[in-house]
Curated annotation (Swiss-Prot):
Gene Ontology molecular function: U3 snoRNA binding
Annotated transmembrane regions: none
Gene that encodes the chain: Tbl3
SMART domains: WD40
GO biological process: endonucleolytic cleavage in 5'-ETS of tricistronic rRNA transcript (SSU-rRNA, 5.8S rRNA, LSU-rRNA); endonucleolytic cleavage to generate mature 5'-end of SSU-rRNA from (SSU-rRNA, 5.8S rRNA, LSU-rRNA); ribosomal small subunit biogenesis
Glycyl lysine isopeptide (Lys-Gly) (interchain with G-Cter in SUMO2) crosslink site(s): 407
Keyword Ubl conjugation: yes
Protein name: Transducin beta-like protein 3
Ranges for the WD repeats: 64-105, 107-146, 149-190, 193-232, 245-284, 290-329, 332-372, 374-413, 419-459, 477-516, 519-560, 562-602, 604-642
Recorded GO CC terms: 90S preribosome; nucleolus; nucleoplasm; small-subunit processome
Lineage, broadest ranks: Eukaryota, Metazoa, Chordata, Craniata, Vertebrata
SUPFAM superfamilies (alphabetical): Quinoprotein alcohol dehydrogenase-like, WD40 repeat-like
Length: 800
């Protein structure tokens, strides 16, 4: 069985996390700096800062209270970032260093819902859920204004772009816009024309015009000189954001007339440009295929010429403002990752299916993201053909799609098929060549789909008409949902796993039943063929993995160790080992021959639905319900090489230590013995040094020359020595040197020094009492010696 492959490959012993793709945006505000190089977005208790060019997370800013961030804003000069948390605290950040420059109470009686800087970057306005609007001077560090009068949550605040006019605009749940004068400390006007929540305010470059948008499907142009409505434009969608465009970007989009133009983003999921004077839509972004994605946010970075939009499923899209050409895509939050696969001939990309109709393709080196639209319901499973250019997906919309990546790394849908009557939950591609694929559905049937020869090549990724797929055969295979399919390496066999607790083996292409694998106590989540042996692996909700012989359908081995359902299993090390993932969030590496789990990997916090191994068998990718995607690297050889190097270094150092001890060069031997972690040898060296008449000076000089980590190790050794009355003198001698020559602040900085002192105190007191008693006894003996008087000898008898 797997023993034959084991002799040709090295067993794996460990995997290490090489890279993580984690959520960095979970809804709320997202903002670009003026240069367009950094992206700021909210993720729970943090504000994450991304490098737009590389997609890397530069820094995460989190307040000490660790409460959710309710609002934030970056100053126009890009120097100051202010965040507000649910704990009613405002934090002023030097965001480039990641440090808090100032922390103060918001004084609001409810969380801050909105925030905005003025054009000078000195004044900050905060709108609270308590209906109050406050203005702060962040340079002089005091509150300047407090405005009341808004009913309910103030969800929108904005300063007039001309700082000399000292005007502040706010909007609350009453759908009106209030204009506040900072100079008079009063409300100048209340603009009432919307019939639903106002979602955004935008100002013209001359400061005389303001545009407001709302969920009442209208945008209103206001004259700020008279505070009257200039134009009401029906846009026929609930608008979440609108932006007044500078003249140059509007003309670049093919708009012929001059004048004010504005862009809207809303529940239709497309960007549209409107002419303010006529109220006509002059540009409509082409609609993407698939389910419509509502846009929840839109902002323009004028200096950088970039437009940032956010979709309802937390994807962030960057457009070039002049042409509205898509520049970058970021997947802020993948929700529950249902499947993940390597893509490309060199496994340079990964595909991710999550709780969304959209697929996400990441380039592993740069984490550049492509968002693929096509399915109209949640994508459930993925599989990749052997060469890596072509892959397939299936979804709850009862359809399947074929996608191809071209040499430039761009992915497009090339074929589509439908025919199942329920959600398509699993899909599997042919292994030898791109000839067919198999799908399994909740309708308990399996369909075989031959691939047409007219598919585009890898040199192109056409967005033209999709090629229709036709099912060649349909077979009812199980009595319950089919959860997994696997095609054998020679494309001759098909394995199916179902909720009915059985796996079945079928002959292809006729879909003829060959046998049934029975033995699991609960439904099966995954089935996999061995790449080298005639063996099938099954993973079940009963927490076990079983290996089955294809010849007689008998169970060869059972692997137990997961505390919950085993969701995925994969053969690694040329079929000699198994890698499994479970709903307990753990990955386990099993050796088939010994039937043992050699390593348990814990990096996920919830179910691990996706597991796939690379072509070279040196990497694995996992995705789970915790929205994490983790790239694992096989570090067995690296760890073995590191261990071998350590052993060789230990041998060399041990020989050097033996030579030093033989030559009685104790001072040099002390540091070497400490680095080798040899407490007994260190004790022997100190005892030898103390036998020297000049022991105190030599011991002090030697100990003080040690590095800090060596002193920490020596202190740990002293704890052990101090427990023994025969060795306590050496421990006390070392301790005395450290206490006499190290400042208390330096000692407290030692690793574990508090615990060390607590361990030293009781034995030191015991030794002190014992030595005190010994000294008293010796003093008493000395006293007796000096005070003893011999009685006179008796006189000799007289001689006769």
């Amino acid at each position: 069985m797997a023993e034959t492959a084991a002799g040709l490959c090295r067993f794996k012993a460990n995997y290490a996390v090489e890279r993580k793709i984690e959520p960095f945006y979970k809804g709320g505000k997202a903002q670009l700096d003026q240069t367009g190089r950094h992206l700021f977005c909210v993720c729970g208790t943090k504000v994450n800062i991304l490098d737009v060019a590389s997609g890397d997370l530069i820094r995460s800013l989190e307040q000490e209270d660790q409460e959710d961030i309710t609002a934030f804003d970056l100053s126009p000069d890009d120097e100051v970032l202010v965040t507000a948390s649910r704990a009613l605290l405002l934090a002023q950040w030097a965001w480039r260093e990641g440090t808090v420059a100032r922390l103060w109470k918001a004084i609001h009686t409810a969380p801050v819902a909105s925030m905005a800087f003025d054009a000078t970057s000195t004044l900050l306005a905060t709108g609270g859920c308590d209906g109050a609007v406050r203005v702060w001077d962040i340079v002089q560090h005091y509150g300047t204004h407090h405005f009341r009068g808004s009913p309910g949550v103030v969800h929108l605040v904005a300063f007039h772009p001309d700082p000399t006019r000292l005007l502040l605009f706010s909007s609350a749940v009453d759908t009106s816009i209030r204009v506040w004068s900072l100079q008079d400390r009063s409300c100048l006007a209340v603009l009432t024309a919307h019939y639903s929540a106002v979602t955004s305010l935008s100002f013209s470059e001359d400061g005389h015009t303001m545009l407001s948008s709302g969920r009442d499907k209208i945008c209103i142009v206001w004259d700020l000189r008279s505070y009257e409505t200039s134009r009401t434009v029906p846009v026929f969608e609930s608008v979440e954001a609108s932006v007044l465009l500078p003249e140059e970007p509007a003309l670049a989009l093919g708009v012929k007339n001059s004048g004010l133009h504005f862009l809207t983003a809303g529940d239709q999921g497309i960007l549209r440009v409107w002419e303010a004077a006529s109220g006509q839509c002059v540009y409509t972004q082409p609609q993407m295929s698939g389910l419509r994605q509502e846009l929840t946010h839109c902002t323009l970075a004028r200096a950088a010429g970039l437009l940032l939009t956010v979709t309802a499923d937390h994807n962030l899209l960057l457009y070039e403002a002049r042409s509205l050409q898509l520049q970058k895509q970021f997947a802020g939050y993948s929700e529950e990752v249902l499947d993940v696969r390597f893509l490309g001939p060199n496994d340079s990309h990964i595909i991710v299916a999550s709780n969304s109709p959209c697929l996400k393709v990441f380039e592993l080196q740069t984490l550049a993201c492509q968002i693929l639209h096509g399915h109209t319901d949640i994508v459930l499973a993925l599989d990749v053909f052997r060469k890596g250019w072509l892959f397939a997906s299936c979804a709850k919309d009862q359809s399947i799609r074929i996608w191809r990546m071209n040499k430039a790394g761009q992915v497009a849908c090339v074929a589509q098929g439908s025919g199942h009557t329920h959600s398509v939950g699993t899909i599997c591609c042919s292994r030898l060549k791109e000839s067919f694929l198999v799908t399994g559905s909740q309708d308990c049937t399996v369909k075989l789909w031959p691939l047409p020869e007219a598919l585009p090549s890898k040199n192109t990724a056409s967005d033209g008409d999709l090629i229709p797929l036709q099912a060649q055969s349909t077979q009812r295979c199980h009595d319950k949902d089919i959860n997994s399919l696997a095609v054998s390496p020679n494309d001759k066999l098909l394995a199916t796993g179902s909720q009915d607790r059985t796996a079945k083996l079928w002959a292809l292409p006729q879909c003829q039943l060959l046998g049934v694998f029975s033995g699991h106590r609960r439904g099966l989540w995954n089935v996999q063929f061995s790449p080298t042996d005639q063996v099938l692996a099954t993973a079940s909700a009963d927490g076990t993995i079983k290996l089955w012989a294809l010849q007689d359908f008998s169970c060869l081995k059972t692997f137990e160790g997961h505390d919950a359902s085993v969701l995925k299993v994969a053969f690694v090390s040329r079929g000699a080992q198994l890698l499994s993932s479970g709903s307990d969030g753990l990955l386990k590496l099993w050796t088939i021959k010994s039937n043992e789990c050699v390593r348990t990997l814990d990096a996920h916090e919830d179910k691990v639905w996706g597991l796939h191994c690379s072509r070279l068998d040196d990497h694995a990718i996992t995705g789970g319900s915790d929205s994490r995607i983790i790239l694992w690297k096989d570090v067995t050889e690296a760890e073995q090489a590191e261990e071998q190097a350590k052993r060789e270094e230990q041998v060399i150092k041990q020989q050097e230590l033996d030579n030093l001890l033989h030559e009685k060069r104790y001072l040099r031997a002390l540091g070497l013995a400490i680095s080798l972690d040899r407490p007994h040898t260190v004790l022997t060296v100190i005892q030898a040094i103390r036998r020297d008449p000049e022991a105190c000076e030599k011991l002090e000089a030697t100990v003080l020359r040690l590095r800090r980590d060596q002193k920490e190790a020596l202190l740990r050794f002293c704890i052990t020595w101090n427990t023994n009355s025969r060795h306590c003198h050496e421990a006390q001698a070392v301790l005395g040197v450290l206490l006499r020559h190290e400042a208390p602040e330096e000692l407290l900085a030692y690793d574990g020094v508090r615990g060390a002192l607590e361990a030293l105190l009781p034995y030191t007191e015991r030794h002190f009492q014992r030595l005190s008693r010994t000294l008293q006894a010796a003093t008493f003996l000395d006293f007796l010696w000096h005070n003893m008087k011999l009685s006179p000898l008796p006189a000799a008898p007289p001689a006769l």
